[in-house]
Curated annotation (Swiss-Prot):
One of the Pfam families matching this protein, by short name: LpxC
Top-level taxon: Bacteria
Function noted in UniProt: Catalyzes the hydrolysis of UDP-3-O-myristoyl-N-acetylglucosamine to form UDP-3-O-myristoylglucosamine and acetate, the committed step in lipid A biosynthesis.
Cofactor entry: Zn(2+)
Sequence similarity: Belongs to the LpxC family.
Active site: H262 (proton donor)
Top-rank EC class of the record's enzyme: hydrolase
Species this chain originates from: Anaeromyxobacter sp. (strain Fw109-5)
Protein name per Swiss-Prot or TrEMBL: UDP-3-O-acyl-N-acetylglucosamine deacetylase
Keywords attached to this entry: Hydrolase, Lipid A biosynthesis, Lipid biosynthesis, Lipid metabolism, Metal-binding, Zinc
Protein backbone atom coordinates (compact mmCIF):
# COMPACT_ATOMS: atom_id res chain seq x y z
CA UNK A 1 0.00 0.00 0.00
CA UNK A 2 1.20 3.52 -0.82
CA UNK A 3 0.11 6.80 0.74
CA UNK A 4 0.71 9.40 -1.95
CA UNK A 5 -2.19 8.21 -4.08
CA UNK A 6 -5.65 9.69 -4.19
CA UNK A 7 -8.41 7.46 -2.87
CA UNK A 8 -12.05 6.78 -3.57
CA UNK A 9 -14.56 4.35 -2.08
CA UNK A 10 -14.25 0.82 -3.45
CA UNK A 11 -17.96 0.16 -4.00
CA UNK A 12 -21.41 1.73 -3.71
CA UNK A 13 -22.91 1.92 -0.22
CA UNK A 14 -26.15 3.53 0.93
CA UNK A 15 -28.06 4.69 3.99
CA UNK A 16 -31.47 6.24 4.59
CA UNK A 17 -32.81 8.78 7.03
CA UNK A 18 -34.56 12.14 7.16
CA UNK A 19 -33.36 15.64 6.48
CA UNK A 20 -32.74 17.54 9.71
CA UNK A 21 -34.29 20.75 8.45
CA UNK A 22 -36.65 19.55 5.71
CA UNK A 23 -37.96 16.55 7.62
CA UNK A 24 -38.17 14.70 4.29
CA UNK A 25 -37.02 11.08 3.82
CA UNK A 26 -33.64 10.86 2.12
CA UNK A 27 -31.44 8.11 0.73
CA UNK A 28 -27.72 8.74 0.33
CA UNK A 29 -25.28 6.64 -1.67
CA UNK A 30 -21.50 6.94 -1.72
CA UNK A 31 -20.12 5.80 -5.07
CA UNK A 32 -16.62 5.55 -6.59
CA UNK A 33 -15.43 8.53 -8.62
CA UNK A 34 -12.49 9.08 -11.01
CA UNK A 35 -9.18 10.55 -9.90
CA UNK A 36 -9.05 14.35 -9.71
CA UNK A 37 -12.85 14.60 -9.80
CA UNK A 38 -13.16 15.56 -6.13
CA UNK A 39 -16.39 15.27 -4.16
CA UNK A 40 -19.57 15.74 -6.17
CA UNK A 41 -23.14 15.76 -4.91
CA UNK A 42 -25.60 14.23 -7.35
CA UNK A 43 -29.31 15.07 -7.13
CA UNK A 44 -30.60 11.79 -8.52
CA UNK A 45 -34.17 13.12 -8.73
CA UNK A 46 -32.99 15.99 -10.95
CA UNK A 47 -30.03 14.30 -12.66
CA UNK A 48 -27.80 17.25 -11.75
CA UNK A 49 -24.26 17.14 -10.36
CA UNK A 50 -23.25 19.78 -7.81
CA UNK A 51 -19.49 19.90 -7.11
CA UNK A 52 -18.49 20.40 -3.47
CA UNK A 53 -17.03 23.88 -3.94
CA UNK A 54 -17.10 27.04 -1.88
CA UNK A 55 -18.28 29.17 -4.80
CA UNK A 56 -21.45 27.06 -4.93
CA UNK A 57 -22.37 27.67 -1.27
CA UNK A 58 -25.79 29.33 -1.16
CA UNK A 59 -26.80 29.13 2.50
CA UNK A 60 -25.04 28.87 5.87
CA UNK A 61 -27.98 29.24 8.28
CA UNK A 62 -27.59 26.39 10.81
CA UNK A 63 -26.00 24.20 8.11
CA UNK A 64 -24.11 24.49 4.84
CA UNK A 65 -25.92 24.20 1.51
CA UNK A 66 -24.56 24.11 -2.04
CA UNK A 67 -26.48 24.55 -5.27
CA UNK A 68 -26.09 24.61 -9.01
CA UNK A 69 -29.07 26.33 -10.58
CA UNK A 70 -32.21 24.90 -9.02
CA UNK A 71 -30.41 21.79 -7.76
CA UNK A 72 -29.72 22.38 -4.08
CA UNK A 73 -28.15 20.03 -1.54
CA UNK A 74 -28.43 21.03 2.11
CA UNK A 75 -26.67 19.98 5.32
CA UNK A 76 -23.56 18.76 3.51
CA UNK A 77 -21.04 19.36 6.30
CA UNK A 78 -21.28 16.02 8.15
CA UNK A 79 -20.75 13.78 5.14
CA UNK A 80 -18.00 16.11 3.87
CA UNK A 81 -16.29 15.87 7.25
CA UNK A 82 -16.47 12.06 7.15
CA UNK A 83 -15.03 11.88 3.64
CA UNK A 84 -12.24 14.30 4.49
CA UNK A 85 -11.53 12.72 7.86
CA UNK A 86 -11.27 9.26 6.29
CA UNK A 87 -8.97 10.46 3.52
CA UNK A 88 -11.36 10.14 0.58
CA UNK A 89 -10.38 12.46 -2.28
CA UNK A 90 -12.97 11.52 -4.89
CA UNK A 91 -16.56 10.40 -4.38
CA UNK A 92 -20.03 10.71 -5.87
CA UNK A 93 -22.47 11.53 -3.08
CA UNK A 94 -25.83 10.61 -4.56
CA UNK A 95 -28.98 11.83 -2.83
CA UNK A 96 -32.59 11.52 -3.92
CA UNK A 97 -33.76 14.86 -2.56
CA UNK A 98 -32.69 18.31 -1.38
CA UNK A 99 -30.99 17.36 1.89
CA UNK A 100 -28.40 14.89 3.18
CA UNK A 101 -29.94 12.56 5.80
CA UNK A 102 -29.01 13.60 9.33
CA UNK A 103 -28.94 9.96 10.58
CA UNK A 104 -27.80 10.28 14.24
CA UNK A 105 -26.60 13.89 14.00
CA UNK A 106 -22.91 13.03 13.77
CA UNK A 107 -20.49 11.89 11.07
CA UNK A 108 -20.16 8.37 12.51
CA UNK A 109 -22.78 6.75 10.23
CA UNK A 110 -20.93 8.08 7.18
CA UNK A 111 -17.63 6.81 8.58
CA UNK A 112 -19.26 3.38 8.91
CA UNK A 113 -20.42 3.59 5.29
CA UNK A 114 -16.88 4.36 4.13
CA UNK A 115 -15.53 1.46 6.18
CA UNK A 116 -18.19 -0.84 4.70
CA UNK A 117 -17.29 0.26 1.18
CA UNK A 118 -13.55 0.06 1.68
CA UNK A 119 -11.18 2.33 -0.21
CA UNK A 120 -9.39 2.06 -3.53
CA UNK A 121 -6.13 3.78 -4.40
CA UNK A 122 -5.99 5.70 -7.66
CA UNK A 123 -3.15 6.47 -10.05
CA UNK A 124 -2.93 10.15 -9.23
CA UNK A 125 -1.10 11.98 -6.48
CA UNK A 126 -2.97 13.70 -3.69
CA UNK A 127 -3.12 17.48 -3.83
CA UNK A 128 -2.75 19.57 -0.67
CA UNK A 129 -3.47 23.20 0.05
CA UNK A 130 -0.48 24.39 2.07
CA UNK A 131 -1.07 27.49 4.21
CA UNK A 132 2.03 29.70 3.92
CA UNK A 133 0.77 32.90 5.58
CA UNK A 134 -1.79 33.46 8.36
CA UNK A 135 -5.33 34.17 7.15
CA UNK A 136 -7.88 35.51 9.61
CA UNK A 137 -11.45 36.67 9.57
CA UNK A 138 -13.45 38.15 12.46
CA UNK A 139 -17.06 39.03 13.13
CA UNK A 140 -17.34 40.79 16.47
CA UNK A 141 -16.13 38.29 19.07
CA UNK A 142 -16.08 35.44 16.54
CA UNK A 143 -12.83 34.30 14.97
CA UNK A 144 -11.67 31.87 12.29
CA UNK A 145 -7.94 31.77 11.50
CA UNK A 146 -5.63 29.51 9.50
CA UNK A 147 -1.91 29.46 10.28
CA UNK A 148 0.95 27.53 8.68
CA UNK A 149 1.46 24.09 10.21
CA UNK A 150 3.08 20.76 9.40
CA UNK A 151 -0.23 18.89 9.64
CA UNK A 152 -3.92 19.67 9.97
CA UNK A 153 -4.90 20.87 13.44
CA UNK A 154 -8.25 22.24 14.60
CA UNK A 155 -8.61 24.17 17.86
CA UNK A 156 -12.20 25.26 18.53
CA UNK A 157 -13.72 27.19 21.42
CA UNK A 158 -17.51 27.08 21.70
CA UNK A 159 -19.10 29.68 23.95
CA UNK A 160 -22.89 29.98 24.21
CA UNK A 161 -25.16 31.75 26.67
CA UNK A 162 -25.80 28.56 28.61
CA UNK A 163 -23.97 27.09 31.61
CA UNK A 164 -23.44 23.72 29.89
CA UNK A 165 -21.81 25.21 26.79
CA UNK A 166 -19.71 28.05 28.19
CA UNK A 167 -16.11 28.41 27.03
CA UNK A 168 -15.78 24.75 25.98
CA UNK A 169 -12.69 23.97 23.89
CA UNK A 170 -11.36 20.99 21.97
CA UNK A 171 -8.15 20.63 19.99
CA UNK A 172 -7.25 17.75 17.70
CA UNK A 173 -4.38 16.97 15.35
CA UNK A 174 -5.85 14.91 12.55
CA UNK A 175 -3.52 11.92 12.32
CA UNK A 176 -4.30 8.33 11.40
CA UNK A 177 -7.64 7.46 13.03
CA UNK A 178 -8.02 10.60 15.13
CA UNK A 179 -11.11 11.75 13.23
CA UNK A 180 -12.85 8.42 13.73
CA UNK A 181 -11.88 8.19 17.41
CA UNK A 182 -12.14 11.77 18.59
CA UNK A 183 -14.51 13.68 16.30
CA UNK A 184 -16.87 11.58 14.18
CA UNK A 185 -19.30 10.56 16.95
CA UNK A 186 -19.94 14.11 18.23
CA UNK A 187 -23.56 15.07 17.51
CA UNK A 188 -25.19 18.29 16.48
CA UNK A 189 -27.01 20.15 19.24
CA UNK A 190 -29.64 22.80 19.82
CA UNK A 191 -31.29 24.66 22.67
CA UNK A 192 -34.91 23.84 23.46
CA UNK A 193 -35.66 27.57 23.67
CA UNK A 194 -34.74 27.93 19.97
CA UNK A 195 -36.74 25.04 18.52
CA UNK A 196 -40.02 26.91 18.05
CA UNK A 197 -38.22 29.79 16.34
CA UNK A 198 -36.32 27.43 14.02
CA UNK A 199 -39.46 25.53 13.05
CA UNK A 200 -41.29 28.79 12.38
CA UNK A 201 -38.48 29.59 9.95
CA UNK A 202 -39.00 26.24 8.21
CA UNK A 203 -35.99 24.59 9.85
CA UNK A 204 -35.43 21.60 12.18
CA UNK A 205 -38.57 19.83 10.91
CA UNK A 206 -36.78 16.48 11.12
CA UNK A 207 -35.03 17.10 14.42
CA UNK A 208 -35.50 14.74 17.37
CA UNK A 209 -33.63 13.31 20.32
CA UNK A 210 -32.52 10.54 17.94
CA UNK A 211 -30.46 12.93 15.81
CA UNK A 212 -29.55 15.90 18.00
CA UNK A 213 -28.58 16.80 21.53
CA UNK A 214 -31.32 19.01 22.98
CA UNK A 215 -30.47 21.27 25.90
CA UNK A 216 -33.12 22.88 28.10
CA UNK A 217 -32.53 25.58 30.68
CA UNK A 218 -30.68 23.30 33.06
CA UNK A 219 -29.88 19.92 31.52
CA UNK A 220 -29.43 17.57 28.56
CA UNK A 221 -32.80 16.11 27.53
CA UNK A 222 -31.36 13.05 25.75
CA UNK A 223 -31.76 10.10 28.15
CA UNK A 224 -28.39 8.62 27.13
CA UNK A 225 -26.57 11.87 27.92
CA UNK A 226 -23.40 12.94 26.12
CA UNK A 227 -20.92 10.81 24.20
CA UNK A 228 -18.03 13.06 25.31
CA UNK A 229 -17.87 15.58 28.17
CA UNK A 230 -16.94 18.21 25.56
CA UNK A 231 -19.20 16.90 22.79
CA UNK A 232 -20.40 20.40 21.85
CA UNK A 233 -16.90 21.66 21.04
CA UNK A 234 -16.06 18.39 19.28
CA UNK A 235 -19.09 18.76 17.04
CA UNK A 236 -18.07 22.29 16.15
CA UNK A 237 -14.69 20.82 15.14
CA UNK A 238 -16.57 18.30 12.98
CA UNK A 239 -18.55 21.09 11.32
CA UNK A 240 -15.39 23.09 10.67
CA UNK A 241 -13.68 20.11 9.02
CA UNK A 242 -16.70 19.64 6.77
CA UNK A 243 -16.83 23.33 5.90
CA UNK A 244 -13.11 23.49 5.11
CA UNK A 245 -13.52 20.48 2.82
CA UNK A 246 -15.10 22.98 0.42
CA UNK A 247 -11.56 24.22 -0.23
CA UNK A 248 -11.53 21.24 -2.58
CA UNK A 249 -8.51 19.41 -1.17
CA UNK A 250 -6.87 18.46 2.16
CA UNK A 251 -5.27 21.27 4.16
CA UNK A 252 -1.86 21.63 5.72
CA UNK A 253 -2.53 24.30 8.32
CA UNK A 254 -3.80 25.01 11.82
CA UNK A 255 -7.36 26.26 12.23
CA UNK A 256 -8.15 28.30 15.32
CA UNK A 257 -11.83 29.10 15.72
CA UNK A 258 -13.71 30.91 18.47
CA UNK A 259 -17.52 30.92 18.34
CA UNK A 260 -17.31 30.38 14.59
CA UNK A 261 -20.14 28.86 12.59
CA UNK A 262 -20.84 27.86 9.01
CA UNK A 263 -20.98 31.44 7.74
CA UNK A 264 -17.62 32.46 9.20
CA UNK A 265 -16.03 29.15 8.19
CA UNK A 266 -17.07 29.72 4.58
CA UNK A 267 -15.93 33.34 4.72
CA UNK A 268 -12.50 32.07 5.75
CA UNK A 269 -12.48 29.57 2.87
CA UNK A 270 -13.36 32.36 0.42
CA UNK A 271 -10.60 34.57 1.80
CA UNK A 272 -8.00 31.81 1.47
CA UNK A 273 -9.00 31.00 -2.10
CA UNK A 274 -9.02 34.68 -3.06
CA UNK A 275 -5.43 35.24 -1.88
CA UNK A 276 -2.92 33.10 -3.78
CA UNK A 277 -0.13 34.69 -1.75
CA UNK A 278 -1.24 32.98 1.46
CA UNK A 279 -1.19 29.42 0.15
CA UNK A 280 0.12 27.06 -2.49
CA UNK A 281 -1.09 23.79 -3.91
CA UNK A 282 1.27 20.81 -4.00
CA UNK A 283 0.81 17.37 -5.49
CA UNK A 284 2.51 14.23 -4.23
CA UNK A 285 4.20 12.12 -6.88
CA UNK A 286 5.62 9.17 -4.95
CA UNK A 287 6.05 7.69 -1.49
CA UNK A 288 9.29 9.68 -1.27
CA UNK A 289 7.08 12.74 -0.71
CA UNK A 290 5.35 11.08 2.24
CA UNK A 291 6.81 10.98 5.77
CA UNK A 292 7.78 7.64 7.27
CA UNK A 293 4.62 7.22 9.30
CA UNK A 294 1.12 7.14 7.87
CA UNK A 295 -0.13 10.57 6.79
CA UNK A 296 -3.07 12.19 8.51
CA UNK A 297 -6.40 12.14 6.78
CA UNK A 298 -6.39 15.87 6.11
CA UNK A 299 -2.69 16.57 5.89
CA UNK A 300 0.75 15.23 6.57
CA UNK A 301 2.60 15.16 9.89
CA UNK A 302 5.64 16.75 8.23
CA UNK A 303 5.84 19.39 5.55
CA UNK A 304 5.87 18.20 1.96
Amino acid sequence: MTYWNQRTVAKRVSCTGVGLHSGKPATLTLAPAPADSGITFVRMDLDVEVPARNDLVVDTMLSTSVALGAARVSTVEHVLAALAGMGIDNCRVEVDGPEIPIVDGSAAPFVCLIQEAGTRQQRAGRRYLVVDQPVEIRDGDKLARLDPADGFVVDFTADFDHPLVTNQSFRVALSDRAFEREVARARTFCFRRDIERMQAAGLAKGGSLDNAIVIDEFSILNPEGLRFPDEFARHKVLDAIGDLALLGMPVLGALTAVKSGHALNQALVRKVLADPGCHRVVRLTSDADVPARRPVALGLPEAI
